[in-house]
Amino acid sequence: MSDQPVSQTAPPLYIVSGGAGAVGEQVARLTLSQFEGAEVPLIIIPNVRDLSQIAEVVERAAHQNGTILHTLMEPSLRRELMRLARERGVAEIDLVGSVLSRLATVLRKEPLGKPGLYQPRRSAYFERLDAIEYTVAHDDGNKPHELHQADIVLVGISRVGKTPLSMYLAVLGWKVANVPLVREVPLPAELFQVDPRRVIGLIVEAEQITARRRWRQRRMGVSIGGNYTSLDAAYDEVEWARRTFRQHGWTTINVTDKSIEESADEIITLISRRFSQLP
């Protein structure tokens, strides 16, 4: 197989915002930088303030098989976008809804729902961008020589949700690396030099792992082969992962049927108690 990048034009990614769309664009560009040779048109739709604009952008995305990434603060607009996207079969990524919901619960206050209110402190703003950039660059075991720079290292077998959980934590300001656990592939030596209190082993029960893997195969339209989608093999693999985590003294978190927000909250609580200097 050639190591040369292959140019691949993909359907567009719509950045929908009630403001300028800068945050959504930044996250999109940082993430796309990890896909060498991929050409994904970014279409920024700023200043979205009414339902007719929502309907228009969803329709455009549906016709082009596009994906919508949105940072809408107004709840009614966000709900309408998600509703229409479901109806039209359009993939959508909500960058702020989960964070708003969590903070509303913690603070016991309702968000204002107005775009453009945030004027970031320069240092905090760039620290968060650094966290996102680090996390994107250290996805799926990349750059193991820099694992020592991570606030959190997630380890787990295929389909436990390492990448989306890593990105959610990064948006909250945490530098996160994730490392795949594969029987045929030795874990990087650098992982064992990381403070084990920073390493979190993720577990998803075998039935859900199998369902996720089968869904992925159907979506990709390919058969990976072997025992990848075997339930018996998944049981064995999950138990092996548990033993591996215990062997190295890594905290194990079972994320079966948990939302990303719940899993992130559990991890943040653990890490914050262990390292009070972290965000």
From Swiss-Prot:
It catalyses: N(tele)-phospho-L-histidyl/L-threonyl-[pyruvate, phosphate dikinase] + ADP = N(tele)-phospho-L-histidyl/O-phospho-L-threonyl-[pyruvate, phosphate dikinase] + AMP + H(+); N(tele)-phospho-L-histidyl/O-phospho-L-threonyl-[pyruvate, phosphate dikinase] + phosphate + H(+) = N(tele)-phospho-L-histidyl/L-threonyl-[pyruvate, phosphate dikinase] + diphosphate. Keywords: Kinase, Nucleotide-binding, Serine/threonine-protein kinase, Transferase. ADP binds at G156, I157, S158, R159, V160, G161, K162, T163. It comes from the Bacteria. One of its GO terms (molecular function) is ATP binding. InterPro entries: Kinase-pyrophosphorylase, PPDK_reg. It is an enzyme of class 2 (transferase). Its EC number is 2.7.11.32, 2.7.4.27. The keyword Cytoplasm does not apply. Bifunctional serine/threonine kinase and phosphorylase involved in the regulation of the pyruvate, phosphate dikinase (PPDK) by catalyzing its phosphorylation/dephosphorylation. NCBIfam families: PRK05339.1. Belongs to the pyruvate, phosphate/water dikinase regulatory protein family. PDRP subfamily. This is Putative pyruvate, phosphate dikinase regulatory protein. It comes from Chloroflexus aurantiacus (strain ATCC 29366 / DSM 635 / J-10-fl).
